Regions:
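Nucleotide/phosphate-binding catalytic cleft detector across ATP-hydrolyzing
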Residues: 1-148, 156-276, 283-329
Length: 329
């Protein structure tokens, strides 16, 4: 299970059985769950006073404990609807940010146990991503993983089944979305919701102002004028989005550089040889690999299915709990 700020993915028997937004809709009076995942996201930013939609995770860690518990329970229910073949006691491996404090780790395992987990193992996300990408994490050579999620970016150097140096920053996909929201308001005077900003990011988001042949079409944004509230149509091109995302992408660059500074020279040589792996939804930002490569002079590879690499790795770890037990807690 990859419990993410933006999406939660559950893998069971090597299949992705749940891939839903990490959103839950609750009744404001009783705090009962009304909807979870995609259904709740459809309600997000569209609710009246009796319903509140919550994103229980912020910056990669649990911000709203009871909402998170309800969300996990709701998503786990999706896995086995109806047939109670495997009884409620489940073994779970959950990916957590490598910068988590003891309290934050405790919150995740408690939530999982309340949501019917019996043996709950936690694995650090960069480690899970490495296993999911197919890197031999037990080999005596250095590999670097950059996992850019919704709430946090995890950068880790892995060797001999352990994390040698890690850097976890709370700058990630959500910040890119917020940058776009702020930019549209400031530059074009158009109010856009968080979801609209996310659509813009997916349609024309870029880390480079020159994408060459990969350039996406302009995206037409509809929204109210911030001042007059009249409807507007604004075409947005990827160059301007690249400019508005520049500062946030630079923060990620600097975090990668500072992780490299803390890497022992022997492992550094391995990383230059093997390249650096990009995982997480942020790895899909157009031109990010080329921009990082240009800045850092080490080749970057995008994982083949970056959105699911952490969940896949957690799934593999669950199947081989005995082999990977030293990676989990």
């Amino acid at each position: 299970m990859d419990l993410g700020t933006a999406n939660t993915i559950i893998i069971s028997d090597d299949k992705i059985v749940v891939d839903e937004p990490s959103v839950v809709a609750l009744d404001r009076h009783t705090d009962k769950m009304i909807a979870v995942g995609e259904k709740a996201k459809m309600m997000y930013e569209k609710t009246h006073d009796n319903i509140r939609t919550v994103r229980p995770l912020r910056d990669g860690v649990i911000a709203d404990f009871s909402a998170c518990e309800q969300m996990m329970r709701g998503l786990i229910k999706m896995v086995h609807t109806g047939h109670r073949l495997f009884s409620p006691s489940l073994r779970m491996v959950i990916g957590v940010p490598s910068g988590s404090t003891e309290v934050e780790l405790r919150a995740v395992s408690d939530s999982a146990e309340h949501a019917d987990g019996r043996d709950v193992y936690l694995i650090f996300e960069p480690m899970a991503a490495a296993i999911g990408i197919g890197i031999d994490v037990e080999a005596p050579e250095g590999n670097m993983i950059v996992d850019i999620g919704g709430g946090s970016t995890e950068i880790a150097v892995i060797s001999l089944g352990g994390i040698v140096s890690n850097n976890s920053i709370r700058t990630a996909g959500d910040d890119l979305t917020a940058d776009i929201q702020e930019y549209m308001s400031r530059q074009h005077n158009v109010k856009v919701s968080e979801r609209m900003a996310e659509r813009i990011k997916i349609a024309v988001g870029s880390a480079l102002t020159d994408l060459g042949d990969e350039a996406p079409e302009d995206y037409i944004v509809h929204g109210p004028n911030r001042i007059t509230a009249l409807p507007m149509e604004v075409p947005v091109c990827y160059q301007e989005i690249a400019h508005c995302l520049d500062k946030t992408v630079a923060k990620i660059e600097n975090a990668v550089l500072s992780a490299l500074e803390n890497t022992p020279p022997e492992l550094y040589a391995d990383i230059v040889k093997n390249g650096i792996w990009l995982a997480g939804g942020g790895a899909l930002l157009r031109g990010l690999d080329r921009r990082l490569e240009g800045k850092i002079n080490i080749p970057f590879h995008i994982a083949e299915d970056p959105l699911h690499s952490v969940a896949k790795g957690a799934g593999i770890a669950l199947k081989n709990v005995d082999r990977f037990s030293f990676l989990m807690r």
